[in-house]
Amino acid sequence: MLRPILASFLLALPLVAQAGDLVLNDIKAQNGVQLSVDELKQLMPNAKVVSYSEGGSSRHWKNEPDGKFVASSDVRRDPNRPGKVANAQGTWRVGDNGTYCVTLEWPKRSESWCRYIFKVGEKYYGVKSITDGTATAQEFEFSK
């Protein structure tokens, strides 16, 4: 009797692991609303931003009105350096196509991306594409 229960549990594990990864189709299914260019231009200047990387790191910065910021990260992607913090110079802008675009110059690498921003309830998510329903949704926090 225990063996069938254990087998069912083990088969379900991959589904549970994937459940935390939201994609654009999930955002749309939850009635997520894409922010317009005008809404982004209202929200982004002076916004305090928290961005969560795919590796689990959280990065913090404040969008200065001049399009610049200094970011810090808790560098969770490197298990050999617990407690390590990295800083980066960055720039931000709102694209004409309705994307929030960021460039970061970390000590060992550069990062540049644009995301379409959706709001679901009180949470924000960014996606690379608004046509690919399987595009991974990255969580953001924006506050003033």
Residues covered by each model-derived region:
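Positively charged n-region of N-terminal signal peptides that target proteins for export
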Residues: 1-4
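Bacterial N-terminal signal peptides
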Residues: 7-14
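Lipid interaction determinants
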Residues: 17-91, 97-144
